[in-house]
Amino acid sequence: MERSRLKTIIILILAMMNLALALSLGLRLYQGRAAETALLTELRERFTAEGCALPENIPTEAPPMVVTMERDSGREQAMAEAILGGGTEYIDQGGGISVYRNGSGQATFRAGGSFSVTLRLPDGEATPMEQAEQRSRAFARAAGFETPTLLSGSGSAAQRYGGYPVSGAGASFSLRGSTLTAEGSYLSSAYLTKTEGPAMSAATALTRFLDFRSQSGAVIAEVTEISLCYLPRSTASAPMVLSPAWRIATDSGNYLVSCADGSVSRG
């Protein structure tokens, strides 16, 4: 009997502790949202005073993790063969430069992630435009780009990682006669590690952006959209690092606010 009563008391104590914890978490969440609402209200007032409009919706999501990657030569070979065809010869030119070539053309990859391709399309049943479309899309799939569409002989494809666009990463394609060229930059790497990065909110990024606008004298009347993206950083001797950033679209172009150091740049 005493044991049963003691057990009941323990259960009640645990239930009360869980309830107290839930109330504490709920209070913190409420206080956090209230503080965020107050910050956004203050931010809108400041932008209005500076003569710059903000969109109705300002994101509240946290930036993604920082991603460190290492170069993947196997992926570069797959990209080269996707656009050049099989039978490629590999040449290590040193300095982080890799070349794949065959009788049709050449693909060059550099340690920083940039690439260039020149290809002479063969005569066949398909027209040069049809061949260019097919090879460009095969190259984009191998690189992890979005699907390109060639209009009037030219097109482009962007790249995403983890659902976020990667600033500066993508490809442009051009067809002149029977010669197809491609150039751009991509994530020439395989996943290595993920780490927590600076948790910069959209509101903080907008504050940094407004300071930049005031100091630089840039003529910007409206912010049209705010979204997260990745900024790639790499050298010939160090792994590629993807750092989160806020992309701020305005009526005079796009700007990037780095979550790592708060710096603002054109994007």
Give the residues covered by each predicted segment.
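Acidic, serine/threonine- and glycine-rich low-complexity intrinsically disordered segments
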Residues: 127-187, 193-196, 200, 219-224
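Generic marker of "main functional regions" within proteins
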Residues: 33, 39, 50, 57, ...
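Exposed beta-strand-loop-beta-strand "reactive/processing" segments of non-cytosolic proteins
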Residues: 74-112, 116-121, 144-178, 227-259
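N-terminal trafficking/processing presequences and adjacent post-cleavage segments
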Residues: 103-126, 180-205
